Regions:
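S-adenosyl-L-methionine
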Residues: 1-142, 182-187, 202-206, 257-285
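Short internal loop-to-helix segment that lines adenine-nucleotide cofactor pockets
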Residues: 74-95, 142-144, 156-158, 174-233, ...
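S-adenosyl-L-methionine-dependent methyltransferase catalytic module, highlighting the catalytic core
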Residues: 149, 162-178
Length: 285
């Protein structure tokens, strides 16, 4: 098994960040800000950590509160340039399905320019932040949250989490590819509700998406089995290809449906451009 320092996916705090955390723990202990008293609870409640930015002339606010959430907000415009370009080309009549929405870093700016966004996310902690971001940006009339694991059928499944943290990613649905990632302080497994998105849309009165974003961190195979009909009726797909067999099969299926790759951008490890981890790809009919 690879040493943790050699893992490619996920976040590992730098020495500087770890020193900051040690200092913060000291302050918390000295002033007893650990939530065990009325004062500390009121103090924590009054904290309102947010990051404000602009995207294409529109104001955005994102809930922060930990290093990962702050990083997501600060790198909105630089982490995935292809995604930013894709969003800028959307129009007011588009309906977008975001499979793997996390805390809404892309669902929110998309919602500011399209008719409707369906945001799918399986991590309850991320869903809480996603809801805050939706309300902070006043797009609750254009975002519907599906708090489920997307898969091939409705059932309870085991989900492996790297950590117990807001803004985390790389969760693994039972049977999916486990990406080679850093583990946090509290890796764990819980049972979650899984649903097929095809079955979900067949059972509700909702406009079908014409654009679909898929970023599911190794869970492509089970997601695909429950997304066949929606993929067939869409005209644009934004897909994160992690160089797995499941990703390869997903792309083959898109081509069989008549999609052609229009653009791609390489994904690199977080420690710089030392290792290619895959490609973000845009497919169109």
């Amino acid at each position: 098994m690879k040493n943790d320092l050699q893992k490619n996916w996920g976040y590992r705090p730098s020495l500087g960040r770890r020193l900051i955390r040690t200092f913060c723990k000291l302050i918390i202990n000295v002033f007893r800000l650990n939530g065990r008293s009325k004062f500390s609870n009121e103090f924590i409640q009054m904290l309102d950590p947010k990051f404000e930015t602009q995207f294409d002339g529109r104001d955005l606010q994102f809930r922060t509160g930990n290093g990962r959430l702050l990083w997501r907000a600060k790198t909105l415009l630089t982490e995935e340039p292809l995604m930013i370009s894709w969003i800028k080309n959307m129009n007011p009549n588009d309906v977008v399905l975001d499979v793997g929405a996390n805390v809404g870093m892309y669902a929110i700016p998309i919602a500011q320019r399209v008719k409707m966004v369906y945001a799918c996310e399986l991590d309850p902690l991320n869903i809480a932040i996603l809801k805050e971001n939706i309300v902070l940006n006043a797009v609750q009339d254009r975002v519907v949250v599906f708090p489920i694991a997307c898969g091939d059928s409705m059932k309870l499944v085991d989900i492996k989490f790297r950590d117990l943290a807001y803004g985390d990613a790389l969760q693994s649905i039972a049977g999916g590819d486990v990406l080679d990632s850093h583990l946090g302080e509290l890796p764990h497994t819980t049972k979650n509700l899984q649903m097929s998105l095809d079955e979900l849309f067949n059972g509700i009165d909702a406009i079908r998406p014409n654009k679909i974003k898929i970023d599911v961190d190794g869970n492509e195979e089970t997601v695909l089995r429950g997304l066949v009909n929606l993929l067939s009726t869409a005209n644009e797909i934004y897909f994160e290809d992690s160089f797995t067999v499941a990703c390869k099969n997903f792309i083959i299926f898109l081509v069989e449906l008549g999609f052609q790759e229009q653009e791609c951008a390489e994904i690199f490890s977080k420690d710089g451009k030392s290792k290619s981890l895959g490609f973000n790809r845009i497919f169109k009919k």
